[in-house]
């Protein structure tokens, strides 16, 4: 069953449908699967409500937290920690390719019996090579940095707030959010692509996204802030957006 994105009412409808299967005996297992952060929009899944519905219907909760582990939550443990529901999530999945250093590989974390089952039945795991020791060591070091200090996380969110404020002052339309992914909305796919190209000529690399990656008529340039960015970097990016917009508008 598929439920509408972040729509708790529709999720309830789908859970009720699952419970009605097999002459009312319900599905053998029910798992609610969601991203922790939706990467094209930068907004967070309503995890408290999802966990409440899981409790009501006896479902498990699985969260793909690829865009949150490392900087969301008090200790960087991700979206469930941010919402205070870590103990109500049964299965975490994620990647080592984003906040944890940009390397390859990923993980599944959960109860021992679930992980043991996946070791035997998870086809991507069964038919994949092991991670290189260098990647494992780099990821462990990144986790130590995340757990050891909140300074980088604080810098990241200051940078995101500064970028949002400055872009708003320059008249750009942004999606609301509290994440370091900041979508700058243009609507028209060709327009977003031309502005991204114009910015690259100024040395600022951004990526335009359009349908079918995002809904029709909601083309955007997705910006991902980093704790490594300085205020000067952010001001330069804002200036490049302004110059790119002006250049495209002038033809």
Task: Give the ranges of each region predicted by the language model.
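Alpha-helical structural signal in soluble globular domains
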Residues: 14-17, 46-56, 82, 88, ...
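Active-site phosphate-binding strand-loop segment of PLP-dependent enzymes
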Residues: 3-63
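Amphipathic, non-transmembrane alpha-helical secondary structure
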Residues: 8-19, 48, 140, 144, ...
């Amino acid at each position: 069953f598929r439920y509408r994105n972040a729509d708790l009412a529709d999720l309830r409808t789908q859970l009720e449908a699952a419970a009605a299967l097999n002459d009312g005996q319900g599905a053998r297992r029910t798992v609610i699967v969601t991203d922790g952060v939706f990467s094209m929009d930068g907004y967070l899944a309503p995890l408290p409500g999802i966990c409440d519905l899981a409790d009501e219907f006896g479902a498990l909760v699985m969260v793909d937290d690829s865009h949150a582990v490392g900087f969301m939550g008090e200790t960087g443990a991700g979206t469930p920690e941010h919402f205070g529901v870590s103990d109500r999530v049964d299965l975490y999945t994620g990647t080592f390719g984003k906040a944890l250093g940009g390397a390859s590989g990923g993980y599944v974390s959960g109860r021992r019996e679930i992980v043991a089952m996946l070791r035997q039945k998870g086809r991507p795991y069964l038919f994949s090579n092991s991670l290189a020791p260098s990647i494992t060591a780099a990821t462990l070091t990144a986790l130590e940095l995340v757990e050891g200090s909140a300074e980088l996380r604080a810098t990241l969110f200051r940078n995101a707030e500064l970028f949002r404020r400055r872009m708003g002052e320059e008249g750009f339309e942004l999606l609301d959010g509290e994440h370091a992914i900041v979508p700058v909305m243009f609507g028209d796919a060709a327009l977003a692509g031309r502005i991204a190209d114009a910015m690259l000529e100024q040395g600022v690399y951004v990526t335009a996204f359009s349908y079918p990656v995002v809904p029709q008529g909601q083309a955007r340039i997705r910006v991902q802030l980093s704790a490594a960015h300085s205020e000067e970097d952010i001001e330069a990016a804002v200036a490049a957006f302004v110059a790119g917009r002006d250049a495209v508008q002038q033809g």
